[in-house]
Amino acid sequence: MSEFAPICIYLVISPLVSLIPLGLPFLFSSNSSTYPEKSSAYECGLDPSGDARSRVDIRFYLVSILFIIPDPEVTFSFPWAVPPNKIDPFGSWSMMAFLLILTIGSLYEWKRGASDRE
């Protein structure tokens, strides 16, 4: 049992360390609002109206997919950022193939009109 004592202590202390900061605001806060401005609309000045769960147009998702394309491109381009005389032919051709696949995908989305606004 003595070899498990540090683990038991950790299992008791770690929830306390995380729950105490979560509980402190409830102890020190007051429910009475003396300032009506605190419950008013923030910044825009308009009271919310309508349903918050409105439908989102599918074109929003297409545009978000278009912005995902540069992320792996940049990530996979970092190892390629070495002097040209230090890149072996396999690394060079694999990067060219990767860029070709990304270019074909971008051209396909462009041809399909994914970035067109209506």
Swiss-Prot record:
Q: Does the keyword Membrane apply?
A: yes
Q: What does this protein do?
A: Core subunit of the mitochondrial membrane respiratory chain NADH dehydrogenase (Complex I) that is believed to belong to the minimal assembly required for catalysis. Complex I functions in the transfer of electrons from NADH to the respiratory chain. The immediate electron acceptor for the enzyme is believed to be ubiquinone.
Q: Which GO terms describe its molecular function?
A: NADH dehydrogenase (ubiquinone) activity
Which reactions are catalysed by this chain? a ubiquinone + NADH + 5 H(+)(in) = a ubiquinol + NAD(+) + 4 H(+)(out)
GO cellular component terms, A-Z:
mitochondrial membrane; NADH dehydrogenase complex
> Which Enzyme Commission numbers does its entry carry?
7.1.1.2
TM segment ranges: 7-27, 87-107
Compartment list: Mitochondrion membrane
Which family is annotated? Belongs to the complex I subunit 3 family.
Q: Which key words are in the record?
A: Electron transport, Membrane, Mitochondrion, NAD, Respiratory chain, Translocase, Transmembrane, Transmembrane helix, Transport, Ubiquinone
Per UniProt, what is the membrane topology? Answer: Multi-pass membrane protein
Q: Say where the protein is mainly found.
A: mitochondrion
UniProt xrefs under InterPro entries: NADH_UbQ/plastoQ_OxRdtase_su3, NDAH_ubi_oxred_su3_sf
Q: Does the keyword NAD apply?
A: yes
Q: What is this protein called?
A: NADH-ubiquinone oxidoreductase chain 3
Coiled-coil region list:
none
